[in-house]
Amino acid sequence: MNPTRTNNRSSRSRAADSGRGGSRFSSTASARSAAPARSGGSGRSAGNGRRPAAVQGEFALPVTVTPALPAVEAFADLDMPGQLLAALTAQGVSVPFPIQGATLPNTLAGRDALGRGRTGSGKTLAFGLALLARTAGQRAEPRQPLALVLVPTRELAQQVTDALAPYARSVRLRMATVVGGMSIGRQANALRGGAEVVVATPGRLKDLIDRGDCRLGQVAITVLDEADQMADMGFMPQVTELLDQVRPEGQRMLFSATLDRNVDRLVRRYLTDPVVHSVDPSAGAVTTMEHHVLHVHGADKNRTTTEIAARDGRVIMFLDTKRAVDKLTDHLLASGVRAAALHGGKAQSQRTRTLTQFKTGHVTVLVATNVAARGIHVDNLDLVVNVDPPTDHKDYLHRGGRTARAGESGSVVTLVTPNQRRDMTRLMTAAGIVPQTTQVRSGEEALGRITGAQTPSGIPVTITAPVAARRERSRSASRGRRSPASAARRVSAHQSSFDAAA
């Protein structure tokens, strides 16, 4: 398939404004235009902790001209290479999610796309299959990728790469993952060897371009995944600089849970008459997600948090700072709970290992900062706990997006002390959510009914690395140690705002 667009994008002005981007644990396609904008699901009852209305303060979806191509109900109905269809079957993927069935007929035909929806809606394959199908059969020159996926965090970059890798292999396309915190030399080598598809965080990709290790002039398909998070993390200047370097007539796809001012600017500046598929940011909440605000007393919050963590099953707990995360993790381990910390102060290898342990169940409680957990996708996770309430309704929606993914059920629980109640009410109003509100104390039946809380064993536990990881570290050590100066030189001089913020 030829990824070049027939419309002349370069004739359109690009002068639009660019984006700018209290507990003891707390810290204070043939068709070239898009479908008419579709709104999210209608509101449901307001008293059962579900999401009754659209998020306040968002911009309207763009109005486009030509209707979208009709949605499909089976991948076999799509104009995709047979190898991709076979790979879908091999991966056990049989029926497209709504966002896939709606957007793929159009993106396979080369149209720009705007997908508005929460994580877990199936958007990775929605953009990934179109990107791979339209790039198949081409070969990239050294340092000149043909397709680009920009994401806000390293973890999300790795998850996108892992999700698309079997499909890329099926059509003989090479992928490279370009993120901070990893060897920039190895990433440069991968680009020099030729990679048709690059999945990148903005900061590291800019570093490689500045070094002369990558050029974007041949990129014909560009995807921005979780664009609102990139804006929140301050990446908009880098994102716009990168988008200005790709082929001006190329295809653009943008996916975002919310459509705020910065994302709206990206849509107006870089998308040409996009096909629009809108899933309410918490559409899963309408039928599968419950929202609970638990009023707790400050003196009891520590014990309440510990009992929730001791539940059967996995849970992600959010706190505001790295110090608070480490403090709670240590307390949970001492109480007999298999917990691990995730924040920007941890080495990338340690974060990757922690995520693997959490996904496999070796760790049952992931204690994380808001930024560090962005982009984490874990299947069958049914509880997210805001130990420290978020300060922004978008952060609340992103935290909640870790559960009730892909139609699964889940709950978001926020612990609120008396002095936080007014702010939490305002936040929920801004998010368009009417939660179930309950006064709870540790050890009470209501807490157990809502969260599965139970008394911890009290027997301290230690989380050790899996045997394979220990063997790998042993092999690395046997090859000799580098000097501190040498090791320091291996760290990129340009660290992304992720580490500073997490």
Language-model features: locations:
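Long, compositionally biased
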Residues: 456-474
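Conserved helicase RecA-like core
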Residues: 70-459, 489-490, 498
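The feature captures the C-terminal accessory region of ATP-dependent helicases
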Residues: 471-502
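N-terminal intrinsically disordered, low-complexity tails of helicases
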Residues: 1-102, 320, 500-502
